[in-house]
UniProtKB/Swiss-Prot annotation:
Residues annotated to bind L-glutamate: 41
Binding-site list for pyridoxal 5'-phosphate: 75-76, 100, 148, 167, 190, 233-234
SUPFAM superfamilies the UniProt entry points to: PLP-dependent transferases
Cofactor(s) recorded in Swiss-Prot or TrEMBL: pyridoxal 5'-phosphate
Name of the molecule in the record: Phosphoserine aminotransferase
Subunit-level organization: Homodimer.
Cofactor note: Binds 1 pyridoxal phosphate per subunit.
Keywords recorded for this protein, A-Z: Amino-acid biosynthesis, Aminotransferase, Cytoplasm, Pyridoxal phosphate, Pyridoxine biosynthesis, Serine biosynthesis, Transferase
UniProt keyword Transferase, yes or no: yes
Length: 358
C-alpha cells in the first residue's frame, strides 16, 4: 500500500505517471529500448525534449517572446546565473522572504553585484510577505514566489516597470501566472512537475541580449543554452521524460486554472483544521500570506508532542510531515499530486491526535 507523501521535495508523483514510467522503463513506446539508453541527439528523444518545452509554454499561455531552457544544477545554480547574466551596472533589488532569497542575495554579493534588499520579513521569522516597492530603474527585481520552509506565498506578484525575476520552485505549475512584467521565471521541477535533476527556466528573449559580450563561462551563459535549444551538453534525459509526463497530466487535469482550484480546496481544508483546533495547532504564516503548497504549523500547547505526531502519522501511513530543521514543527506539503481525499485523511488524523492529547 502506498504511503501518503507530504514531503517538501522531491515529492509525491501522480500514480498514473509512475505506472506509465514503469511500463515504458525497459521498452519505450514499443521501440525495444529505454528512453534512458538513447542519445539526446536522436529524433526520438528530441520529440520528448521539444514537446516538453512546448507543453510547458502552453500551460502558462506563453508565446514565442519566451525561451524555455532546461538546465541542471538545481534552482540554486540560478542564484548565481541570474546576476552573472542579467546584472548590468546598476542596482539589483531583492525582497528577502526566506532562506532561498537569502541564498540568492549571498550569491549575487559574491559576484560583486550591487545588491539592495528592499524589503524583508526576517525580523518576524519570515511569517509574512512584506510590502515591497521596487524602483523603476533597477537592473532587475527579484522575489521568491513561495517559501517552502515558512509556508508563505505571494498571492499576487509586485507590479514593476523593472524586469521581474521569480523563483517559483515550490509553486511551479500550481496556478496561472500573469507574465506581463516577468523577465525570468524559474524553478527546480522536483516538487510540482517531475523529479530532481532538472530546472526549467522561462526567459524573455530580449533579456538574452544582456548575456552578449559578457565574460561568462559557456555553461553558465543563458545565451549558450538558448542558441543550442538546451542541448549544448547532454541534458538530464530521464528527468525531461518525466517532466513531459507531468505536463501531459496537468493538461489532462484541465490546465492550471483547474489545478489551482483543487489546490485551493486542499489548502482551505487543512487551514480550517488548524484554525478550528481551539489553539491546539497554530500556523506559522500570517493568514493573508498563507501558502497553498506548504502548510507549516506547531502544536502550540505542547511542542514536545510534535515528534509523537510525526511518528503516529507515519504509523497511520503518512510520511514527510517533520518540519524543516530551521523552523521545526510540522509541515505538510500539499503539491499538485496530492488529492483532496489524502489531505482529508491528514485532517482526520489531526483531529484524532488532538482528541487524544489536548
Amino acid at each position: 500500500m502506498r504511503k501518503i507523501n507530504f514531503s517538501a521535495g522531491p515529492s509525491t508523483l501522480p500514480l498514473e505517471i509512475l505506472e506509465q514510467a514503469q511500463k515504458e522503463l525497459c521498452d519505450y513506446q514499443g521501440r525495444g529500448y529505454s528512453i534512458m539508453e538513447i542519445s539526446h541527439r536522436t529524433k526520438v528523444f528530441e520529440e520528448v525534449h521539444f514537446g516538453a518545452q512546448e507543453k510547458a509554454k502552453k500551460l502558462y499561455g506563453l508565446n514565442d517572446d519566451y525561451e524555455v531552457l532546461f538546465l541542471q544544477g538545481g534552482a540554486s545554480l540560478q542564484f548565481a546565473m541570474i546576476p552573472m547574466n542579467l546584472a548590468l551596472n546598476g542596482i539589483c533589488e531583492y525582497a528577502n522572504t526566506g532562506v532561498w532569497t537569502k541564498k540568492a542575495i549571498k550569491e549575487a554579493q559574491i559576484l560583486g553585484v550591487n545588491v539592495k534588499t528592499v524589503a524583508s520579513s526576517e525580523e518576524s521569522n519570515f511569517n509574512h510577505i512584506p510590502r515591497v516597492e521596487f524602483r523603476d530603474n533597477a537592473d532587475y527585481a527579484y522575489i521568491c514566489s513561495n517559501n517552502t520552509i515558512y509556508g508563505t506565498q505571494y498571492q499576487n506578484y509586485p507590479k514593476t516597470k523593472t524586469p521581474l525575476i521569480v523563483d517559483a520552485s515550490s509553486d511551479f505549475f500550481s496556478r496561472k501566472v500573469d507574465f506581463s512584467n516577468i523577465a525570468l521565471f524559474y524553478g527546480g521541477v522536483q516538487k510540482n512537475a517531475g523529479i530532481s535533476g532538472l530546472s526549467c527556466i522561462f526567459i524573455r528573449k530580449d533579456m538574452l541580449e544582456r548575456s552578449k559580450n559578457k565574460q561568462i563561462p559557456s555553461m553558465l551563459n543563458y545565451l549558450t543554452h538558448a542558441e543550442n535549444q538546451s542541448l549544448f551538453n547532454t541534458p538530464p534525459t530521464f528527468a525531461i521524460y518525466m517532466f513531459i509526463l507531468e505536463m501531459d497530466w496537468l493538461l489532462n487535469q484541465g490546465g492550471l486554472d483547474k489545478v489551482h482550484e483543487k489546490n485551493s480546496q486542499k489548502a482551505a481544508m487543512l487551514y480550517e483544521c488548524i484554525d478550528l483546533s481551539n489553539g491546539f495547532y497554530k500556523g506559522h504564516a500570517d493568514k493573508k500570506d498563507r501558502s497553498l503548497m506548504n502548510v507549516s504549523f506547531n502544536i502550540a500547547k505542547n511542542k514536545d508532542l510534535e515528534p509523537l505526531f510525526v511518528k503516529e502519522a507515519e504509523e497511520a501511513g503518512m510520511i514527510g510531515l517533520k518540519g524543516h530543521r530551521i523552523l521545526g514543527g510540522i509541515r505538510a506539503s500539499i503539491y499538485n499530486a496530492l488529492n483532496l481525499d489524502q489531505v482529508k485523511t491528514l485532517c482526520e488524523f489531526m483531529k484524532e491526535f488532538q482528541g487524544k492529547y489536548a
